[in-house]
């Protein structure tokens, strides 16, 4: 008989509504001696069976639901999950000509704590929960069954694993070591990805739709691409006919890759058309403001400022500061494309921050378009936390 957890009376509601998280305060008792990541049965206070979940004794999220059906959590289970996820994405893969996409979006694909990104034939896994770690071999075996020629690499070098009682880890799980550059394609744009050393799993796949939508704002414009990383938005700006694009980032290796990506797409990278500037964006924005340098379009896609609720207030100040500075260096009628990937900051709060930035900048600002994560990053209706990326196109008058 498997181990089991019984919920506090009244705590069943979220599970009945199929939310996949069960917090420690919602558990009345544990029967058996479940180990880190082990699958347990979940029961209501009345003894009614509710779900199969992975047990995590060191996390505030004490259990994460694998299934709301009575089924074994084994290789066959993950094969079905992966097949369903691939089928869900077939339309967008064909529509956008993708050779890089998110295959598994954790809880939203019924695999809590599991992220799998595909770059050509390299599948990059981030296993962020005790249950994901416990099921690692089943997940890898399932990938091999669905994609027989795949290579699987792990990028679980994420600090959140510590909350689950896990160490950070990386390495080959199956097949070959990824090369320094794996070239993917999206919307006809070629992008070199460093799976082993790049941010996240190598690239920001979630911004693909926003990159495409940005093109309509840049034709014949002077564009400043802040926190450019390997040039994603800058590439689309060049494709969209921008007069000039300045890509600014603090990482020289990222800028070198951005330049390589521009060359890969055969874009004009003369200094009249494309600049790759190693700079602290906060300092750079202030320098441009003080010098009176103006742009037609500013793209503001910073890294996550808030990893926890304790950091949220500081993150709000950071977002307001950079957006205020961006508004101050825009020409009248210019466009600010601004984004936040902090899940703790919802769209309403982000919109308020932009409004506060407009007041501090002394500019009249209009929201003209809203953005969210790309279609291969779905959000399950029972798991609103899966919606994390939000953005706005703003006209700055």
From Swiss-Prot:
InterPro entries noted in UniProt: PUA (IPR002478), PUA-like_sf (IPR015947), PUA_sf (IPR036974), RLMI (IPR023542), RlmI-like_PUA (IPR041532), SAM-dep_methyl-trfase (IPR019614), SAM-dependent_MTases_sf (IPR029063)
Cross-referenced SMART domains: PUA
Residues annotated as domain PUA: 2-80
Keywords: Cytoplasm, Methyltransferase, RNA-binding, rRNA processing, S-adenosyl-L-methionine, Transferase
Subcellular location: Cytoplasm
Keyword flag rRNA processing: yes
Keyword S-adenosyl-L-methionine (UniProt): yes
Reactions catalysed according to its record: cytidine(1962) in 23S rRNA + S-adenosyl-L-methionine = 5-methylcytidine(1962) in 23S rRNA + S-adenosyl-L-homocysteine + H(+)
Its EC number(s): 2.1.1.191
GO cellular component: cytoplasm
HAMAP family xrefs: 23SrRNA_methyltr_I (MF_01857)
UniProt similarity note: Belongs to the methyltransferase superfamily. RlmI family.
Record protein name field: Ribosomal RNA large subunit methyltransferase I
The organism's taxonomic lineage, starting at the top: Bacteria, Pseudomonadati, Pseudomonadota, Gammaproteobacteria, Vibrionales
Gene name of the encoded protein: rlmI
């Amino acid at each position: 008989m498997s181990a089991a957890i019984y919920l506090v009376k009244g705590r069943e509601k979220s599970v009945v509504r199929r939310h996949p998280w069960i917090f420690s305060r919602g558990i009345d008792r544990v029967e058996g001696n479940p180990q880190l990541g082990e699958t347990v049965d979940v029961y209501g206070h009345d003894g009614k069976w509710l779900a199969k979940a992975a047990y995590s004794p060191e996390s505030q999220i004490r259990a994460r639901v694998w299934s709301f059906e009575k089924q074994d959590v084994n290789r066959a289970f993950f094969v079905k999950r992966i097949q369903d996820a691939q089928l869900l994405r077939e339309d967008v893969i064909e529509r956008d000509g993708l050779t890089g996409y998110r295959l598994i979006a954790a809880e939203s694909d019924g695999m809590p704590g599991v992220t799998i990104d595909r770059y050509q034939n390299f599948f990059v896994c981030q296993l962020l929960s005790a249950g994901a770690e416990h099921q690692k071999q089943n997940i890898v075996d399932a990938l091999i069954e669905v994609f027989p020629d795949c290579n699987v690499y792990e990028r679980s070098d994420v600090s959140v694993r510590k909350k689950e009682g896990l160490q950070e880890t990386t390495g080959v799980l199956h097949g070959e070591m990824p090369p320094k550059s794996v070239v993917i394609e999206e919307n006809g744009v070629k992008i070199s990805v460093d799976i082993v050393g790049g941010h996240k799993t190598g690239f920001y796949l979630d911004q693909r739709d926003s990159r495409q939508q940005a093109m309509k704002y840049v034709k014949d414009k002077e564009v400043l691409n802040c926190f450019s990383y390997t040039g994603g938005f800058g590439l689309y700006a060049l494709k969209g006919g921008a007069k000039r694009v300045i890509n600014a980032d603090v990482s020289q290796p990222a800028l070198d890759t951005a330049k390589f990506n521009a060359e890969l797409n055969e874009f004009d990278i003369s200094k009249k058309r494309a600049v790759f500037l190693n700079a602290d964006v906060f300092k750079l924005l202030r320098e441009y403001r003080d010098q009176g340098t103006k742009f037609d379009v500013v793209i503001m896609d910073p890294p996550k400022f808030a990893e926890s609720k304790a950091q949220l207030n500081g993150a709000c100040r950071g977002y307001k500061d950079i957006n205020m500075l961006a508004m101050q260096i825009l020409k009248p009628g210019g466009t600010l494309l601004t984004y936040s990937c902090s899940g703790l900051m919802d769209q309403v709060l982000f919109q308020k921050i932009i409004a506060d930035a407009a007041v501090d900048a002394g500019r009249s600002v209009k929201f003209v378009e809203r953005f969210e994560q790309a279609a291969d990053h779905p959000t399950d209706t029972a798991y609103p936390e899966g919606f994390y990326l939000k953005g706005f196109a703003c006209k700055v008058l």
